[in-house]
Amino acid sequence: MENCIFCKIIKGEIPSKKVYEDDDVFAFHDLHPVAPVHFMLIPKLHIASLDNVEEKHRDLLGKIVLLAPKLAKEQGCTDGFRTIINTG
């Protein structure tokens, strides 16, 4: 999407500090962190909101959920971490 900040980050139009990237997913440190380790894990496919999720997105969202603890541990969160999903 033209005005989507996340799409611009994925395309490299807005600089970010990458944590992880594959064909489907992009993870980067939050531009305004509120914790010592604060990164965002987003699909490369533009999905504007959880309100727009469909059955066809099941595998992609599952991949993101499975990546979250792996990346958190790699970033030093060995004693637990908080996962937040913002909608809208």
What role is predicted for each listed range?
Residues 1-88:
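HIT superfamily nucleotide-processing domains
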